[in-house]
Amino acid sequence: MKYLSAILEEKRREVEALKRQNPSARYRDVASSLPSCRGFARALQGEGGSIRLIAEVKKASPSRGVIVEDFDPVRIALAYEALGASALSVLTDRHFFQGSAGYLQQVAAAVSLPVLRKDFIIDELQIFESRIMGADAILLIVAALEPSELHDYLQMAGEIGLDVLVEVHDRHELALAIESGAEVVGVNNRNLKDFSVDPATSASLRPYFPSGVIAVSESGLKTADDIALVRDAGFDAVLIGEGLQVSSELRSLSWPNA
């Protein structure tokens, strides 16, 4: 997992710097005193077989470099809200994705939709930080955490009102997510070894989701056929970033909230 290892190494340095500046107990107290979040998990539940859209506000990626040169996160977020998205995802990783906490804060203030903080969370301080910056949900990546950390971080997030999207790549990680109590699980179609993508990854794992767990397909969804594939496999939602930026076909689909 070459890409993930490099990202986590950089993230550990960032977290250590954050810890030197801000005690975790102080962050926890502030996060616990904030008003209720907008329900991320609730927004992904629907009837009638429609698949929900989590639209990602994304400037760049390690595999593609800069995707949007004239990047205006609020303009993009408002366009996605008008498109019919049920929730938004905002990249906050600076080093690899050119994101920022400021982007999430701006977006959360501008829209009525729940907002997911998309980053590599490896420490409890980041969970409290996410709540303070305005996130309604966070991403936890099974491949980046020990099983005990995954369990504990899910519990911590719930205690301060955050929903959690738990990301998996295979059956083993899916089992760990379920055992840890995940209620929303995303299958990442991207291979973390080489960053190649295959939407069929989601379809192959869907039969192993227990009833009641919200299923999300992530990454590499670029055509209406890709959406149909995961919809027909029984997914509740899709998370799309780059695809919405480059594909008019995806933007023209009829999303439930439009």
From Swiss-Prot:
Enzyme class: lyase
One GO MF term: indole-3-glycerol-phosphate synthase activity
BP-aspect Gene Ontology terms: L-tryptophan biosynthetic process
Keywords, sorted A to Z: Amino-acid biosynthesis, Aromatic amino acid biosynthesis, Decarboxylase, Lyase, Tryptophan biosynthesis
Pathway the protein acts in: Amino-acid biosynthesis; L-tryptophan biosynthesis; L-tryptophan from chorismate: step 4/5
InterPro entries: Aldolase_TIM, Indole-3-glycerol_P_synth, Indole-3-glycerol_P_synth_dom, Indole-3-GlycerolPSynthase_CS, RibuloseP-bd_barrel
Catalytic activity: 1-(2-carboxyphenylamino)-1-deoxy-D-ribulose 5-phosphate + H(+) = (1S,2R)-1-C-(indol-3-yl)glycerol 3-phosphate + CO2 + H2O
Protein name: Indole-3-glycerol phosphate synthase
